[in-house]
Each structure stands twice: as C-alpha cells, then as structure tokens.
Amino acid sequence: MQAQRSERRPDRNETFSGSIEFTIPVDLAAWQNRRTTQAEAISAASVLIKYAATEALAGRDPIACPVHLTILAFFLPPGAAKFRRGDLCHTGRPDTDSVAAVIMSALDGIAWKQRGQVAELLVMKRYGPRPGVAVVIEPADDLMTMATAGEA
C-alpha cells in the first residue's frame, strides 16, 4: 500500500498568489549564430525553459488568472571595458519581442493555459557575467489591487 502525499495540490480554480521565479542558463546570442539554424537554437532554448518552469511550478496546474511576466535576459559583453562595467543595456539581437515570444510560447500549457493571460509584460536585456534568462511570473490582479489602493 502506498503512502499518501501530505501536500495538497492547488485546485484549478484557486487564485494564484505569490510569484514563480526561475532562471535558465541559455545563451540567447546563439540564436544569431550562423553555424546552427535559428530554429534549432530556439528549440533547444524552449526545452530548457519548459524544464525550468516545470521544476518551479512543482506539480501545480497552469495558472488560470491574468499574469504579469518579467523577463531579464543577460548577454556576455563584447571585449570593450565600458561593457564590462555592467552599466549598459544590450541593444543588439535578438530583440526584446523575439525573446518574449520564445519564452511565452514555451510556457504555454505549463505556467499558464494560454499566452493571452499575460496582461503585463516587462522585458529587459542587460550585459552580465554569464548568459541566461531570469523569469518572474506574478498574478496581475495583485498588481492592480496595489495600484488602485493608492488612489483611495
């Protein structure tokens, strides 16, 4: 006879609270590498994103409420010293909408039911010591509550 798990799995209709955060050690600059096709690089990144999201959700069902998605992409700086200080934004390829599209597509059905649930989106590209992507998913309802509380 198997022992029952003591932790309760959240119901599909339960409101989502808190935030889900995870990082993916992926080099987005590889999307522009001529040796591998862009489709192969994006496919490999999608697998990493799906795995990281599945681990972060820890068995929860996809979120049913509107969400705020924050994406922070880090790229290795070029050799110039001014880039190594970390105070400059990355302005090269891939562009922010491409980064967001790949991440949002990979999270469909895992983090949320459909990508239309992303009500707020913030994408930042920076130079950093290691390439990678940090993703934070928060309920958009909580952000609206905080914004309207200041108006009262």
Put a short name on every predicted segment.
Residues 1-152:
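Acidic, proline/glycine-enriched N-terminal capping motif
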